[in-house]
């Protein structure tokens, strides 16, 4: 492949484009590429054409570079590539363009990126030029001379010494000179071992589009107190929690907000905007707080405002800047001596480790956890079990499986009982004793069916609807309920079964509203100028 060299002033005028996607959220691993060229396949259902952005940027200058012909196996119409504006490029690229769908022929399209058995026009293709070559740590250590870089062990020891000095009361002079905010050190309290779950949960994949950790079990240790404090988070110790992200989509009252200092923090809009957390997910002692996701702030910002005083934190991706927590301290709450609390937690953990003697006995749950098979036992007159249920012989077998909810048909009213007696009298006409025994046997025969705890809720609701008016009850003692309001739990269960479609529609509407807000913020970010880190002058995005 030919080596690519690009001048800083190498630009091209963007003409009317039929395909101009917004690729800021396109995450490409930052690996070692000798020519800094990256080729990635795009998907039309994900990377859609941004019509409004194409109209806004038409006629503006966009960065470009000479695409090497050796990148493709066959001749390619180089004049058909559409170079993207800087604000629409993926993170870490200085220039890049896209070939629209059907522009490249099958012979010229990269074989490794084309799906087997693909039919129709070729998918769009992104060709980008990275800003700088970033080799892996192992390769970089082999290329450097001995003694140039500090060993990892020394860096770890410096971190331990710095944390010990801060706990003992030593205050770096550089931190005292800053008046806008204080720099805090994150201390994660040890979490008690959770009991083993009967269900297998898949690992949450690493992503950088959104980052909302749960910081309720985190302490922030600072050498001096300011109205605002900044702490570097760890994507390893403070991972992304989807439930926190869903909680941030609620009302503004649940997520208190405040204005970040304009002179310190750059304007971040759209997908890079600060995410304000609900109070139940914030550290103790803060009235408001927000999280800035990884890769949002530049390395220059960290060098200017945090520098060498920032305590290192383990990250899954060390090639991008770490996430930050910016919190507003609550002055009304009494001060907490966090140093003593941290020392107490350390001593407690050390004593627990000594008692366990590095065995699994220390993490063994106190009670035996049995896997629950059943959830609801239903009494029907049909011998065939409802869809999604299994049959049992008696109630003892159902309760042994773990069924706690019992569903039976509601007793008949006075009118219905009168009609039943009339039908029984019809059966006794003519002294037909055999038919009488048959009628009474069919009326008294009951069949039991059980539903699993993870059965389809639609199947449960349809089976209860066939009963007519169903009566639910809990098969549990007061000691087993542990303070749970059983009547209220049954009311909520009935509400979920009856209004399940409305609940689904409401949840879907919340997600659609969130998508609308994200698209609106993204379009506003395209039109908003950004501040240059060097001179502080507002520049227009290209």
Swiss-Prot record:
It comes from the Eukaryota. The keyword Repeat applies. Changing residue 252 to E: In strain: ZW141 and ZW142. Keywords: Repeat. InterPro entries: DM7. Belongs to the DM7 family. This is DM7 family protein CG15333. The lineage of its organism: Eukaryota, Metazoa, Ecdysozoa, Arthropoda, Hexapoda.
